[in-house]
Amino acid sequence: MTKISKIIDELNNQQADAAWITTPLNVYYFTGYRSEPHERLFALLIKKDGKQVLFCPKMEVEEVKASPFTGEIVGYLDTENPFSLYPQTINKLLIESEHLTVARQKQLISGFNVNSFGDVDLTIKQLRNIKSEDEISKIRKAAELADKCIEIGVSYLKEGVTEREVVNHIEQTIKQYGVNEMSFDTMVLFGDHAASPHGTPGDRRLKSNEYVLFDLGVIYEHYCSDMTRTIKFGEPSKEAQEIYNIVLEAETSAIQAIKPGIPLKDIDHIARNIISEKGYGEYFPHRLGHGLGLQEHEYQDVSSTNSNLLEAGMVITIEPGIYVPGVAGVRIEDDILVTNEGYEVLTHYEK
Protein backbone atom coordinates (compact mmCIF):
# COMPACT_ATOMS: atom_id res chain seq x y z
CA MET A 1 0.00 0.00 0.00
CA THR A 2 1.36 3.43 -0.94
CA LYS A 3 1.95 6.30 1.45
CA ILE A 4 -0.98 8.24 -0.01
CA SER A 5 -3.24 5.19 0.28
CA LYS A 6 -2.44 5.01 3.99
CA ILE A 7 -3.45 8.64 4.42
CA ILE A 8 -6.68 8.03 2.50
CA ASP A 9 -7.42 5.07 4.77
CA GLU A 10 -7.01 7.34 7.78
CA LEU A 11 -9.28 9.94 6.18
CA ASN A 12 -11.93 7.28 5.82
CA ASN A 13 -11.36 6.03 9.37
CA GLN A 14 -11.91 9.52 10.78
CA GLN A 15 -14.61 10.46 8.24
CA ALA A 16 -12.48 13.40 7.13
CA ASP A 17 -12.29 15.08 3.74
CA ALA A 18 -8.59 15.90 3.47
CA ALA A 19 -5.24 15.98 5.28
CA TRP A 20 -3.02 19.04 5.59
CA ILE A 21 0.70 18.21 5.86
CA THR A 22 2.91 21.09 7.02
CA THR A 23 6.15 19.76 8.51
CA PRO A 24 8.75 20.35 5.74
CA LEU A 25 10.29 16.89 6.23
CA ASN A 26 6.87 15.26 6.02
CA VAL A 27 6.04 17.22 2.89
CA TYR A 28 9.31 15.91 1.45
CA TYR A 29 8.42 12.38 2.54
CA PHE A 30 5.21 12.46 0.50
CA THR A 31 6.31 14.60 -2.46
CA GLY A 32 10.06 14.21 -2.92
CA TYR A 33 10.41 17.98 -2.79
CA ARG A 34 12.33 19.61 0.08
CA SER A 35 11.97 23.25 1.07
CA GLU A 36 12.82 25.47 4.02
CA PRO A 37 9.93 27.94 3.79
CA HIS A 38 10.73 29.98 6.91
CA GLU A 39 7.58 31.98 7.68
CA ARG A 40 5.92 31.28 4.32
CA LEU A 41 3.16 28.73 3.84
CA PHE A 42 4.43 25.39 2.53
CA ALA A 43 1.93 22.56 2.76
CA LEU A 44 0.53 19.49 1.04
CA LEU A 45 -3.22 18.94 0.81
CA ILE A 46 -4.21 15.29 0.32
CA LYS A 47 -7.86 14.75 -0.55
CA LYS A 48 -9.97 11.67 0.00
CA ASP A 49 -10.05 10.99 -3.75
CA GLY A 50 -6.24 10.87 -3.80
CA LYS A 51 -5.71 14.30 -5.33
CA GLN A 52 -2.63 16.10 -4.03
CA VAL A 53 -2.15 19.87 -4.00
CA LEU A 54 1.14 21.49 -2.97
CA PHE A 55 1.06 25.08 -1.73
CA CYS A 56 4.41 26.85 -2.06
CA PRO A 57 5.92 30.27 -2.77
CA LYS A 58 5.69 31.11 -6.47
CA MET A 59 9.46 31.43 -6.69
CA GLU A 60 9.74 27.68 -6.00
CA VAL A 61 7.20 26.47 -8.58
CA GLU A 62 9.77 25.59 -11.25
CA GLU A 63 11.80 23.58 -8.75
CA VAL A 64 8.68 21.68 -7.70
CA LYS A 65 7.95 20.89 -11.36
CA ALA A 66 11.44 19.38 -11.65
CA SER A 67 10.88 17.22 -8.56
CA PRO A 68 9.13 13.81 -8.36
CA PHE A 69 5.87 15.50 -7.32
CA THR A 70 3.12 15.05 -9.93
CA GLY A 71 0.15 16.69 -8.25
CA GLU A 72 -1.30 20.18 -8.59
CA ILE A 73 0.82 23.17 -7.56
CA VAL A 74 -0.54 26.37 -6.05
CA GLY A 75 2.23 28.95 -6.20
CA TYR A 76 1.62 32.29 -4.54
CA LEU A 77 3.34 35.66 -4.33
CA ASP A 78 4.28 37.13 -0.97
CA THR A 79 1.53 39.69 -1.47
CA GLU A 80 -1.16 37.06 -2.10
CA ASN A 81 -3.36 35.01 0.22
CA PRO A 82 -2.61 31.39 -0.80
CA PHE A 83 -6.07 30.19 0.26
CA SER A 84 -7.79 32.65 -2.06
CA LEU A 85 -6.04 30.96 -5.01
CA TYR A 86 -7.59 27.59 -4.18
CA PRO A 87 -11.01 28.17 -2.60
CA GLN A 88 -12.37 25.04 -0.93
CA THR A 89 -14.93 23.91 1.58
CA ILE A 90 -13.49 21.15 3.77
CA ASN A 91 -15.83 19.96 6.47
CA LYS A 92 -13.26 17.94 8.44
CA LEU A 93 -9.51 18.37 7.98
CA LEU A 94 -6.76 16.21 9.45
CA ILE A 95 -3.72 18.22 10.54
CA GLU A 96 -0.32 17.71 12.13
CA SER A 97 -1.42 18.92 15.53
CA GLU A 98 2.13 18.72 16.87
CA HIS A 99 3.30 21.22 14.25
CA LEU A 100 0.48 23.50 13.11
CA THR A 101 0.33 26.89 14.83
CA VAL A 102 -2.87 28.39 16.19
CA ALA A 103 -2.49 31.29 13.75
CA ARG A 104 -2.29 28.95 10.77
CA GLN A 105 -5.23 26.93 12.04
CA LYS A 106 -7.31 30.12 12.07
CA GLN A 107 -6.31 30.71 8.44
CA LEU A 108 -7.47 27.20 7.55
CA ILE A 109 -10.83 27.74 9.22
CA SER A 110 -11.30 30.92 7.24
CA GLY A 111 -9.69 29.85 3.97
CA PHE A 112 -11.18 26.36 3.65
CA ASN A 113 -14.33 26.86 5.74
CA VAL A 114 -13.18 24.03 8.01
CA ASN A 115 -15.79 22.88 10.48
CA SER A 116 -13.70 20.42 12.53
CA PHE A 117 -10.19 19.00 12.81
CA GLY A 118 -8.58 15.64 13.47
CA ASP A 119 -4.97 14.50 13.88
CA VAL A 120 -2.84 12.73 11.28
CA ASP A 121 0.41 12.79 13.30
CA LEU A 122 0.45 9.14 14.39
CA THR A 123 -0.36 7.82 10.91
CA ILE A 124 2.62 9.69 9.46
CA LYS A 125 4.92 8.52 12.26
CA GLN A 126 3.88 4.92 11.65
CA LEU A 127 4.55 5.29 7.94
CA ARG A 128 8.00 6.77 8.50
CA ASN A 129 8.78 4.14 11.12
CA ILE A 130 9.14 1.39 8.48
CA LYS A 131 11.84 2.27 5.98
CA SER A 132 11.88 1.37 2.29
CA GLU A 133 14.93 -0.22 0.69
CA ASP A 134 15.85 3.18 -0.76
CA GLU A 135 15.64 4.82 2.66
CA ILE A 136 17.70 2.04 4.23
CA SER A 137 20.44 2.44 1.62
CA LYS A 138 20.67 6.16 2.39
CA ILE A 139 20.81 5.59 6.15
CA ARG A 140 23.46 2.92 5.59
CA LYS A 141 25.58 5.45 3.67
CA ALA A 142 25.01 8.09 6.35
CA ALA A 143 26.20 5.56 8.94
CA GLU A 144 29.30 4.80 6.88
CA LEU A 145 30.11 8.51 6.79
CA ALA A 146 29.59 8.78 10.54
CA ASP A 147 32.18 6.02 10.97
CA LYS A 148 34.53 8.13 8.87
CA CYS A 149 33.88 11.14 11.12
CA ILE A 150 34.94 9.15 14.18
CA GLU A 151 38.06 7.98 12.35
CA ILE A 152 38.90 11.58 11.45
CA GLY A 153 38.37 12.75 15.02
CA VAL A 154 40.39 9.99 16.66
CA SER A 155 43.33 10.56 14.32
CA TYR A 156 43.39 14.23 15.35
CA LEU A 157 43.64 13.58 19.09
CA LYS A 158 46.79 14.85 20.78
CA GLU A 159 47.64 16.32 24.14
CA GLY A 160 46.62 19.96 24.40
CA VAL A 161 44.03 19.97 21.60
CA THR A 162 40.67 21.43 22.61
CA GLU A 163 37.26 19.86 22.26
CA ARG A 164 36.17 22.61 19.91
CA GLU A 165 39.25 22.15 17.72
CA VAL A 166 38.46 18.46 17.27
CA VAL A 167 34.84 19.27 16.38
CA ASN A 168 35.95 21.84 13.79
CA HIS A 169 38.46 19.42 12.28
CA ILE A 170 35.85 16.67 11.91
CA GLU A 171 33.24 18.94 10.34
CA GLN A 172 35.70 20.53 7.92
CA THR A 173 37.43 17.30 6.88
CA ILE A 174 34.25 15.28 6.30
CA LYS A 175 33.23 17.79 3.62
CA GLN A 176 35.88 16.18 1.44
CA TYR A 177 33.63 13.09 1.40
CA GLY A 178 30.59 14.99 0.11
CA VAL A 179 28.96 15.76 3.46
CA ASN A 180 27.28 19.17 3.57
CA GLU A 181 25.39 18.90 6.83
CA MET A 182 25.69 17.16 10.16
CA SER A 183 22.62 15.54 11.75
CA PHE A 184 23.06 17.72 14.86
CA ASP A 185 25.77 19.70 16.64
CA THR A 186 28.81 17.45 16.86
CA MET A 187 29.78 16.56 20.43
CA VAL A 188 33.36 15.91 21.52
CA LEU A 189 33.91 15.84 25.29
CA PHE A 190 37.09 15.06 27.23
CA GLY A 191 37.39 13.20 30.51
CA ASP A 192 34.76 13.85 33.16
CA HIS A 193 33.24 16.60 31.00
CA ALA A 194 31.51 13.68 29.27
CA ALA A 195 29.63 13.05 32.54
CA SER A 196 27.27 15.72 31.19
CA PRO A 197 25.27 13.62 28.66
CA HIS A 198 24.54 16.65 26.45
CA GLY A 199 27.63 18.70 27.24
CA THR A 200 28.81 21.47 24.94
CA PRO A 201 32.32 21.21 23.45
CA GLY A 202 34.53 24.05 24.62
CA ASP A 203 38.12 25.01 25.32
CA ARG A 204 38.96 22.09 27.60
CA ARG A 205 42.31 20.62 26.56
CA LEU A 206 42.97 16.91 26.18
CA LYS A 207 45.17 15.27 28.80
CA SER A 208 46.70 11.82 28.86
CA ASN A 209 44.80 8.94 30.42
CA GLU A 210 41.22 10.02 29.89
CA TYR A 211 38.33 9.03 27.68
CA VAL A 212 37.09 11.08 24.73
CA LEU A 213 33.39 10.90 23.90
CA PHE A 214 32.31 11.48 20.29
CA ASP A 215 28.58 11.82 19.52
CA LEU A 216 27.83 12.77 15.92
CA GLY A 217 25.96 12.02 12.73
CA VAL A 218 25.73 13.19 9.14
CA ILE A 219 22.91 13.75 6.69
CA TYR A 220 23.11 11.87 3.39
CA GLU A 221 20.39 12.64 0.85
CA HIS A 222 18.12 13.88 3.66
CA TYR A 223 18.65 10.83 5.91
CA CYS A 224 20.51 10.89 9.23
CA SER A 225 22.99 8.81 11.14
CA ASP A 226 23.68 9.12 14.86
CA MET A 227 26.50 7.30 16.64
CA THR A 228 28.62 7.59 19.77
CA ARG A 229 32.02 6.22 20.62
CA THR A 230 34.02 6.67 23.82
CA ILE A 231 37.72 6.33 23.01
CA LYS A 232 40.68 5.76 25.33
CA PHE A 233 43.49 8.34 25.16
CA GLY A 234 46.19 6.67 27.21
CA GLU A 235 45.05 4.62 30.22
CA PRO A 236 42.02 6.09 32.03
CA SER A 237 41.41 5.29 35.70
CA LYS A 238 40.41 1.80 36.75
CA GLU A 239 36.88 2.96 37.61
CA ALA A 240 36.49 4.73 34.27
CA GLN A 241 37.53 1.57 32.42
CA GLU A 242 35.15 -0.49 34.53
CA ILE A 243 32.33 1.88 33.58
CA TYR A 244 33.27 1.52 29.91
CA ASN A 245 33.13 -2.28 30.08
CA ILE A 246 29.69 -2.19 31.74
CA VAL A 247 28.31 0.13 29.07
CA LEU A 248 29.74 -2.06 26.31
CA GLU A 249 28.20 -5.17 27.86
CA ALA A 250 24.83 -3.41 28.17
CA GLU A 251 24.90 -2.25 24.56
CA THR A 252 26.03 -5.61 23.18
CA SER A 253 23.39 -7.53 25.12
CA ALA A 254 20.59 -5.19 24.07
CA ILE A 255 21.55 -5.33 20.40
CA GLN A 256 21.75 -9.13 20.42
CA ALA A 257 18.12 -9.30 21.63
CA ILE A 258 16.74 -7.27 18.73
CA LYS A 259 14.31 -9.03 16.40
CA PRO A 260 10.75 -8.46 15.14
CA GLY A 261 8.03 -9.01 17.71
CA ILE A 262 10.05 -8.00 20.77
CA PRO A 263 8.60 -5.10 22.81
CA LEU A 264 10.85 -2.05 22.70
CA LYS A 265 10.70 -1.80 26.49
CA ASP A 266 12.27 -5.26 26.77
CA ILE A 267 15.35 -4.05 24.90
CA ASP A 268 15.63 -1.08 27.25
CA HIS A 269 15.24 -3.35 30.27
CA ILE A 270 18.10 -5.61 29.16
CA ALA A 271 20.62 -2.76 29.08
CA ARG A 272 19.20 -0.98 32.12
CA ASN A 273 19.25 -4.12 34.26
CA ILE A 274 22.91 -4.80 33.48
CA ILE A 275 23.87 -1.26 34.44
CA SER A 276 21.71 -1.34 37.58
CA GLU A 277 23.06 -4.71 38.73
CA LYS A 278 26.59 -3.28 38.54
CA GLY A 279 25.55 -0.41 40.82
CA TYR A 280 25.32 2.39 38.27
CA GLY A 281 21.56 2.51 37.64
CA GLU A 282 21.17 6.07 38.94
CA TYR A 283 23.84 7.20 36.48
CA PHE A 284 21.89 6.06 33.40
CA PRO A 285 19.29 8.86 33.20
CA HIS A 286 17.90 8.51 29.69
CA ARG A 287 16.07 6.06 27.43
CA LEU A 288 18.10 3.44 25.59
CA GLY A 289 17.47 4.75 22.10
CA HIS A 290 15.16 6.20 19.48
CA GLY A 291 14.05 5.95 15.89
CA LEU A 292 16.27 7.27 13.11
CA GLY A 293 15.52 8.44 9.58
CA LEU A 294 14.78 11.86 8.13
CA GLN A 295 15.41 13.15 11.65
CA GLU A 296 18.09 12.08 14.10
CA HIS A 297 15.39 11.55 16.75
CA GLU A 298 12.08 10.19 15.56
CA TYR A 299 9.34 7.66 16.34
CA GLN A 300 9.71 5.25 18.07
CA ASP A 301 11.58 5.58 21.35
CA VAL A 302 13.40 2.64 22.89
CA SER A 303 12.30 3.21 26.46
CA SER A 304 11.16 1.32 29.53
CA THR A 305 7.53 2.38 28.95
CA ASN A 306 7.15 1.63 25.22
CA SER A 307 5.20 -1.61 24.76
CA ASN A 308 5.12 -1.37 20.95
CA LEU A 309 6.84 -4.18 19.08
CA LEU A 310 9.95 -4.11 16.94
CA GLU A 311 9.17 -4.55 13.24
CA ALA A 312 11.35 -5.36 10.26
CA GLY A 313 12.32 -2.16 8.47
CA MET A 314 12.68 -0.06 11.61
CA VAL A 315 15.98 1.75 12.17
CA ILE A 316 16.76 2.55 15.80
CA THR A 317 19.68 3.60 17.94
CA ILE A 318 20.94 1.71 20.97
CA GLU A 319 22.91 4.03 23.26
CA PRO A 320 23.36 3.12 26.93
CA GLY A 321 25.47 5.43 29.04
CA ILE A 322 26.87 5.90 32.52
CA TYR A 323 27.70 9.42 33.68
CA VAL A 324 29.51 9.81 37.01
CA PRO A 325 30.43 13.43 37.84
CA GLY A 326 34.10 13.86 38.57
CA VAL A 327 34.93 10.39 37.25
CA ALA A 328 33.84 9.74 33.65
CA GLY A 329 31.03 9.78 31.15
CA VAL A 330 30.74 6.81 28.81
CA ARG A 331 28.17 6.27 26.06
CA ILE A 332 28.30 3.83 23.16
CA GLU A 333 25.75 4.14 20.37
CA ASP A 334 25.06 2.26 17.17
CA ASP A 335 22.46 2.51 14.42
CA ILE A 336 20.53 -0.73 14.04
CA LEU A 337 18.30 -1.97 11.22
CA VAL A 338 15.65 -4.46 12.32
CA THR A 339 15.57 -7.28 9.74
CA ASN A 340 13.22 -10.21 9.21
CA GLU A 341 15.75 -12.49 10.90
CA GLY A 342 16.96 -10.13 13.61
CA TYR A 343 19.15 -7.10 13.14
CA GLU A 344 21.97 -5.48 11.17
CA VAL A 345 24.40 -3.05 12.79
CA LEU A 346 24.95 -0.13 10.40
CA THR A 347 27.74 1.66 12.29
CA HIS A 348 31.04 -0.17 12.52
CA TYR A 349 33.79 1.88 14.13
CA GLU A 350 35.59 -0.28 16.68
CA LYS A 351 34.50 -0.28 20.32
Curated annotation (Swiss-Prot):
Residues annotated to bind Mn(2+) 1: 226, 290, 319, 333
UniProt binding sites for Mn(2+) 2: 215, 226, 333
Classification via Pfam families: Creatinase_N, Peptidase_M24
Cofactor details (free text): Binds 2 manganese ions per subunit.
UniProt EC number: 3.4.-.-
UniProt keyword annotations, A-Z: Hydrolase, Manganese, Metal-binding
InterPro entries: Creatin/AminoP/Spt16_N, Creatinase/aminopeptidase-like, Creatinase_N, Pept_M24, Peptidase_M24B, Peptidase_M24B_aminopep-P_CS
Xref: Gene3D superfamilies: Creatinase/methionine aminopeptidase superfamily, Creatinase/prolidase N-terminal domain
SUPFAM superfamilies: Creatinase/aminopeptidase, Creatinase/prolidase N-terminal domain
A GO molecular function held by the record: metal ion binding
Top-rank lineage group of the source organism: Bacteria
Cofactor: Mn(2+)
PANTHER family reported in the protein's UniProt record: AMINOPEPTIDASE, DIPEPTIDASE YKVY-RELATED
Homology family: Belongs to the peptidase M24B family.
Name of the protein in question: Uncharacterized peptidase SAS1635
Organism, scientific name: Staphylococcus aureus (strain MSSA476)
